[in-house]
Amino acid sequence: MIQIRQFQWADYDAVVAVWTAAGRDALPRAELQAKLTRDPELFLVAETGGEVVAVVMGTYDGRRGWILRLAVHPARRRLGIATLLVHELENRFQSLGCPRVNLLVMPDNAAGLGFWQTLGYLPFPDVLCSKPLQEATP
């Protein structure tokens, strides 16, 4: 049985393991701590048998919700876990009065785009712009 709940610091290593298994970079504790000061209720884990198997992280700026990261351990994919996590996150956005949720999908991620479209997320022709505010260290 899948249980969805809010992230706790005791989950950090398990969440990093899910991100790593899913091919994602881990967020450093300091970066995560900053995120958790804003909207900790939008950082969710899915667990089964006491094991964290998936994670979703969102944020709400008062105008729009953003789904920042979704990852499911590869051994637990295609079981509906991601859909459960997203629906719970959407419910939490709604309870905050959030009128719209956005997310970014990499252009070469056809499977990811297909997943989001099945949940009603539609592509927009927006252009993403980015500017580093600190120089990268070699």
Protein language model features and the residues they cover:
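Residues lining the SAM
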Residues: 104, 119, 127
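Short, charged/polar, Gly/Pro-enriched secondary-structure boundary elements
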Residues: 136-138
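Conserved beta-strand-loop-alpha-helix junction that forms the acyl-donor binding cleft
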Residues: 74, 103-112, 130, 134
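Short acidic, glycine/proline-enriched helix-loop-strand junctions
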Residues: 111, 115-124
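Loop/helix-junction capping segments adjacent to catalytic residues or to phosphate/diphosphate-binding pockets
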Residues: 26, 79, 110
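Conserved acetyl-CoA-binding loop-helix of GNAT-fold acetyltransferases
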Residues: 78-91, 118
